[in-house]
Regions:
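Terminal-appendage/accessory-domain detector
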Residues: 1-41, 138-152, 158-387
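Function-dense linear segments that define catalytic or interfacial modules
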Residues: 22-62, 76
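Contiguous domain-boundary segments centered on the initiation and propagation of an alpha-helix
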Residues: 42-46, 61-64, 71, 288-292, ...
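Short acidic alpha-helix initiation/capping motifs at coil-to-helix transition points
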Residues: 45-46, 97-102, 349-353
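Short connector loops/turns at beta-strand edges and beta->alpha or beta->beta junctions
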Residues: 28, 47-49, 54, 76, ...
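Alpha-helical support elements that line or immediately flank enzyme active sites
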Residues: 44-65, 102-114, 215-233, 276, ...
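Glycine-rich, mobile lid/loop segments that gate access to catalytic sites or pores
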Residues: 57-155, 162, 167-174
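Short helix-coil transition sites and intra-membrane helix breaks within transmembrane domains
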Residues: 39-45, 93-98, 211
């Protein structure tokens, strides 16, 4: 159905299902306030929910079915991440698109009740849309990657539903998906799938929910900056700062002195400086024209990377961010940040989630309605229209 009848979060004209999936995906990632997982290095909920909230307006989907769809998509994203290894992301692929599109196809296939053969075709079709390079980070196209993943994931499921076929053995064959997108550290997808493990990905490898609207690699230095803010009373007495962090992260958080808010999200130096100076970090912190002190502070910050082994996993607490501050009087302060707020050790509270909703433009009266009512047996469409 290509009629323009899908309402869009954030306002604007109604769009077709394809255009709605794309725009929802772009908006979900545009301020980097999404979730992420460390196995594939993707942002699982952004493309999956962007697809589901679009489809739910033309097909009845219960909240329970929404959960199931998300879990199936997440499961496949994790399995693919395990098979490809961290090298997929390290080489330069943006897995939110390369793997996210496949997870989205699986999630949509689940809620559309495709049979096993159709779903196998859908996720294979989705590999033809696997694209997106990390070298685009710091520009608008990074958010577009999530839009592409959402849009193409739905297209893949619909093509399969209507008889479209693809090579169901594409994963492990010679010159197949794993070989081309992986490395010498990759392993066959089938080796990672045991029936006893199915459905447990979210338990074994839970997603992280961002506390601040920046790249996930910038989260730990913000924590460190907020701690240092309470310890350093006269910021102008800072002589120099060094940030030591895992070498792979520099391929992402590479902007020392950002030129705009998009680059600022991928700037360890700017995020640290802003948190240290202001004692807080929110969406306004990314308006660099109003944070001149932060920009000036970045010039005092030196970025130093350290090597990690081939077995490195993202956000492993064994490989922390280390912030070293030298004051004008020669005194030294060191903060070592190993865990991320929003992760396993410091999960977000309901009030933190509520604040994210409000920061993104949500209304408090709507939030109260959602919090005070039980929606488990209701349709996703009802909540969409409420918001």
């Amino acid at each position: 159905n290509n009629s323009k009848n899908i309402k869009i979060f954030g306002g604007g004209k109604k769009l077709s299902i394809s255009a709605a999936c794309f725009l929802h995906g772009v908006r979900s990632a545009s301020i980097d306030f999404d979730d992420y997982e460390y196995v594939a290095g993707s942002h699982p909920s952004a493309p999956i929910f962007s697809a589901l909230i679009s489809i739910a307006q033309i097909k009845k989907i219960s909240i329970e079915e929404t959960y199931q769809g998300w879990l199936v998509g997440y499961e496949l994203i994790i399995k693919l991440g395990q098979a490809l290894s961290y090298d997929h992301y390290y080489k330069g692929w943006h897995s939110a698109n390369t793997i996210g599109v496949i997870g989205t196809a699986a999630a949509v296939s689940k809620v559309l009740k495709l049979n096993a053969d159709q779903m196998a075709n859908a996720i294979s079709i989705a590999t033809s849309f696997s694209s997106g390079l990390k070298q685009q980070f710091g520009t608008d196209i990074k958010a577009f990657h999530v839009g592409f993943a959402s849009q193409a994931g739905v297209q893949s499921a619909l093509l399969a539903k209507n008889g479209g076929t693809a090579n169901q053995d594409i994963w492990n064959i010679e010159r197949g998906f794993i070989e081309l997108y992986g490395s010498k550290f990759s392993k066959k997808l089938n080796n990672n799938i045991k029936k006893s493990d199915l459905g447990n990905a979210i338990i074994k490898f839970p997603n992280f929910i961002k506390f601040w609207p920046v790249c996930s690699y910038s989260q730990r230095v913000i924590q460190g900056g907020l701690i240092l803010n309470k310890k350093i009373f006269i910021k102008k007495n800072i002589k120099s700062i060094t940030i030591e962090f895992p070498e792979p992260w520099f391929r992402v958080s590479k902007f020392h002195i950002p030129k705009n808010s998009t680059e600022a999200r991928f700037s360890l130096s700017y995020c640290l400086a802003t948190a240290l100076i202001n004692g807080k970090f929110d969406l306004n912190s990314l308006n660099i024209s109003k944070n001149k002190k932060s920009l000036n502070m970045t010039r005092k910050i030196k970025l130093v990377t350290y090597k990690v082994p081939n077995t490195f996993e993202d956000y492993d607490p064994k490989y922390p961010d280390i912030i070293k501050v030298i004051m004008n009087d020669g005194s030294i302060l060191i903060e070592k940040i190993s865990h991320i707020k929003g992760g396993n050790n410091y999960p977000l509270k309901d009030e933190d989630i509520d604040n994210k909703f409000l920061m993104c433009g949500g209304k408090k009266n709507i939030l109260n309605k959602i919090r005070n009512q039980k929606y488990k047996k209701k349709n996703l469409k009802e909540i969409i229209f409420l918001i």
